[in-house]
Amino acid sequence: VEFKPKKNNENNILFDFQDVKNHPFGNNIKLFISSIDKYFKFLKNHDIHIKSQNNFPHSSGIASSASSMSCLSSCLVDIESLNTKSKEDSYYMKKKSFIARLGSGSASRSIQGPITLWGSSNSYLGSSDLYAINISDDVNKVFHDYQNSILIIDPGVKKISSSIGHKLMNENPFSNTRFDLARN
């Protein structure tokens, strides 16, 4: 992420993905940044150029948005911290996770780890719907070195976006029951 003082009053956000200038995913990034500018005073006075690389296929359903939103959120909070009075690391970790969640719920869990929990739970003191917390110390050590293997059969774009899927879930008459089950 590069940023420099604005030359005009326009909201200048450039996004390159895999060295492709103004990649279509840039529209999602611009909407995201517009939705979070109230949390970052410096965004109103700066132009931003984001150059992104990702080894996950875009919009395929395997967390490419989580990795991008967690990385972008971390960069923005790190930039903000350059010009703010020193705060504890836990403040910045919570803010990174909070901002990442606004871009992708899964992104909130990608900030710290290795094992995190996002969502308020009676089982974990300090858990929150607003940001993820590290629960690595509470999990059996056998899970501390687990790894995933992902076989990509079709790198194409999935038919239903996560945003549409989430909207369908929120409008589902069984959603409150599902959310309650997830919390307990």
Language model segments and positions:
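ATP-binding N-lobe of GHMP and related small-molecule kinases
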Residues: 1-60, 74-90
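Structured loops at beta-to-helix junctions and adjacent beta-edge loops in soluble globular domains
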Residues: 4-6, 121, 151-154
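C-terminal nucleotide
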Residues: 10, 137-184
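Generic secondary-structure signature for well-ordered alpha-helical cores
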Residues: 34, 38, 77, 81, ...
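Short acidic, glycine/serine/threonine-rich loops at helix termini
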Residues: 62-64, 112-113, 121-122, 161-165
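Alpha/beta catalytic cores of group-transfer enzymes, especially the acyltransferase/condensing modules
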Residues: 91-144
